[in-house]
Amino acid sequence: MKYHDLRDFLTLLEQQGELKRITLAVDPHLEMTEIADRTLRAGGPALLFENPKGYAMPVLCNLFGTPRRVAMGMGQEDVTALREVGKLLAFLKEPEPPKGFRDLFDKLPQFKQVLNMPTKRLRGAPCQQKVFSGDDVDLQRIPIMTCWPEDAAPLITWGLTVTRGPHKERQNLGIYRQQLIGKNKLIMRWLSHRGGALDFQEWCAAHPGERFPIAVALGADPATILGAVTPVPDTLSEYAFAGLLRGTKTEVVKCLSSDLEVPASAEIVLEGYIEPGEMAAEGPYGDHTGYYNEVDNFPVFTVTHITQREDAIYHSTYTGRPPDEPAVLGVALNEVFVPILQKQFPEIVDFYLPPEGCSYRLAVVTMKKQYAGHAKRVMMGVWSFLRQFMYTKFVIVCDDDVNARDWNDVIWAITTRMDPARDTVLVENTPIDYLDFASPISGLGSKMGLDATNKWPGETQREWGRPIKKDPEVTARIDAIWDELAIFNDGKGA
């Protein structure tokens, strides 16, 4: 499935009953969140609010509200097929030369996909059909949602922020929330280790006192949106990865106010700059943890141009206690992570981020253990191999006879195979999400690893327990007479 733009995707969703148009007037202030939250929890469709109260622009919510829609956005039929996306990323992260003709033939599909990586630059684009600049720039014309009662102000949640560092050829795409503070002002809330923040830091060092160009695309095609939240290798741009997902090159157009390139098919583009040193207090906001976060200072984004389609759609979401859209994305992207981790650690059998763990804060790993201390090596690997897991607070490692996605199995392993003193690893003073108010210092906290594997010689001096297993011959005999026993139908019928 290939989508040229967001509207192609919406057309398909509507054909498959995965999009609901809402003609009743609904307020972006709290009401849309209430409707979207109820719909997502019921596994319902994407929502297109066609008549937001007080605005002329439709609002799209709950676009990736089910794992299947995430898979569809990546060009796959179902979530299990996302393992293939992960295998492609693992190949791109550490490409190996073909070992022979047969291996070359097997890898031809991957090499063919790589041809779609370069972007296609356009002179004009749908996202620039209407242009607002100077005094005509007014962010308050956009139906930006206020999601929770104690939120500080309306909040842009699905903006693809485009940046480029002074020493980098490729652009970075990241999704950072942006608080509305004026008709042409937003607060750019990015964490210090994220790509956009790193680009800004490098710019300030290379060009002291100069304005940092920035652009935000709203309503891009699904491959580009999902490319911005997928663990692509640092050497690969999100635009290139989107081209791989889509099967065609990503079309971009140069901004009117800078050399940055934005998705040509985007619904809305905000162009402007960050003035070094201009900061503002951001928050509080209800977040994916289920709590309001504390107020902190972040850079101010001054918008100089708004470009958009003639009949633009505003793409939005809300975040709150799981399940929410980030949690659903986490469930789907979990399948992408598995092959990437297995490429580096072949002993890993499965990797699971439970959605109730707020997307990434707790991970369960199952593995084929091969030596004493092996589980601890895998723990450290999870924390360090991919940048996405530097904020993961808890890593539970189990043997491959445990189902990582079944809490009954995992809790059984923890309670029967762990000694708390021996098998708990605590690491202090590590990077932690700023939103994690449980950490003693903002941005710095501890991590816990739980080794719930069977212990090998050297890890214990005791005889280790053997799991109880049924006699297969007895099981087969009882299977043969089970219906005749009629235990669950009061003896009435077979």
From Swiss-Prot:
Pfam family, one: UbiD
Cofactor(s), names only, from the UniProt record: prenylated FMN; Mn(2+)
NCBIfam families per the UniProt record, alphabetical: PRK10922.1, UbiD family decarboxylase
Binding-site residues for Mn(2+), renumbered to this chain: N172, E238
EC number per UniProt: 4.1.1.98
Function as written in the Swiss-Prot or TrEMBL entry: Catalyzes the decarboxylation of 3-octaprenyl-4-hydroxy benzoate to 2-octaprenylphenol, an intermediate step in ubiquinone biosynthesis.
Keywords: Cell membrane, Decarboxylase, Flavoprotein, FMN, Lyase, Manganese, Membrane, Metal-binding, Ubiquinone biosynthesis
GO molecular-function term, one example from the UniProt record: 3-octaprenyl-4-hydroxybenzoate carboxy-lyase activity
Co-factor binding details: Binds 1 prenylated FMN per subunit.
Family: Belongs to the UbiD family.
Record organism: Citrobacter koseri (strain ATCC BAA-895 / CDC 4225-83 / SGSC4696)
GO biological process per UniProt: ubiquinone biosynthetic process
Pathway(s) of this molecule: Cofactor biosynthesis; ubiquinone biosynthesis
UniProt name for this protein: 3-octaprenyl-4-hydroxybenzoate carboxy-lyase
Bilayer disposition of the protein: Peripheral membrane protein
InterPro entries the UniProt entry points to: UbiD, UbiD-like_C, UbiD-like_N, UbiD_bacteria, UbiD_Rift_dom
GO CC aspect terms: cytosol; plasma membrane
Domain of life, per lineage: Bacteria
Entry-linked PANTHER family: 3-OCTAPRENYL-4-HYDROXYBENZOATE CARBOXY-LYASE-RELATED (PTHR30108), FERULIC ACID DECARBOXYLASE 1 (PTHR30108:SF17)
Compartmental location: Cell membrane
Record has Flavoprotein as a keyword: yes
Catalytic activity: a 4-hydroxy-3-(all-trans-polyprenyl)benzoate + H(+) = a 2-(all-trans-polyprenyl)phenol + CO2
Binding site for prenylated FMN: I175, Y176, R177, R189, W190, L191, R194, G195
Subunit structure: Homohexamer.
Active-site residue numbers: D287 (proton donor)
